[in-house]
Amino acid sequence: MLELNGVPVDDTYCEAFDGIYSRIIVTAKHKWLLKKAAYSATALPSTVFGEAEGGVEKWLSPQETPDGRLGAICQIWVQKSKKFLDVLMREMGKRIRQGILVVPTTRVFNATESETKFDAEINVGRCGDGYEWEDEMWGRKVIRVPIMFGEFIIERYIGYAEGIAGGNIWYFCESEEAALEAGEAAVEALKQLDGVITSFDICSAGSKPETKYPEMGPSTNHYFCPTLKGKIPDSKVPDGVKSIPEIVINGIKREVVEKAMFVCMDVVSKIDGVVRISAGNYEGKLGQHKIYLKDLIEKYS
């Protein structure tokens, strides 16, 4: 069996898939307002229901933002499909209007390096009810939307591009405390990488493709539920394991997802109580991209 820092690693792969993302910079006058907007806009991962998921890639200093204020890079993702642009427009509009615009002093700027863009006048600016106007500020073409607090400013053209979603690792732990410590350290370490998000941070409920109740969406991966060990004949939970979290990673290209997966593996392997590392493998039923853990260890360790 493979090992990393003395922790066994399954010789397996994760299944990732193509997705469409938009990367934006959110700024605000105060840190607490920025956090409220960034977390609101990226909350509730729901691509499995034909909607969107997101995450905060990193926090920015005033020296790193277009308007010289505190900021955050956020990513919003939708599934790649024939009508992805319709879904992206709907979901970006919803998350910006209801997650960011309603938070005082916020502004939104494009951070996607892409030739493909959508017009934010259509799905955000028009909530100004025709009283919004176009301007040029900070060297960018923006829409200024009058609101009761003052105004909301958004860059008019927001980019989108194709990336890789669903990269993941699982880590098997002797306790919930070890699982939380390892997961928090891994998610924090990824803030040092450009281009990746963890839409669930520490995901407590890994799922499986098949289900008894399709109307519910993804169901619990019962094979790996510690509380079912001894209750079902096909449990795959090792002796002594009490928690098996998952960290799901989306990135702007495959290389950054691979690097992020290895960083997570390396970080969690150094935490006491982590006894095994694996990944979500569904025999090709979920994603078209296979990222082998063995290859990551050989490439990055």
Curated annotation (Swiss-Prot):
SUPFAM superfamilies: Formylmethanofuran:tetrahydromethanopterin formyltransferase. Keywords: Transferase. It holds the Pfam family FTR. One of its GO terms (biological process) is one-carbon metabolic process. It comes from the Archaea. Belongs to the FTR family. One of its GO terms (molecular function) is formylmethanofuran-tetrahydromethanopterin N-formyltransferase activity. This is Formylmethanofuran--tetrahydromethanopterin formyltransferase-like protein.
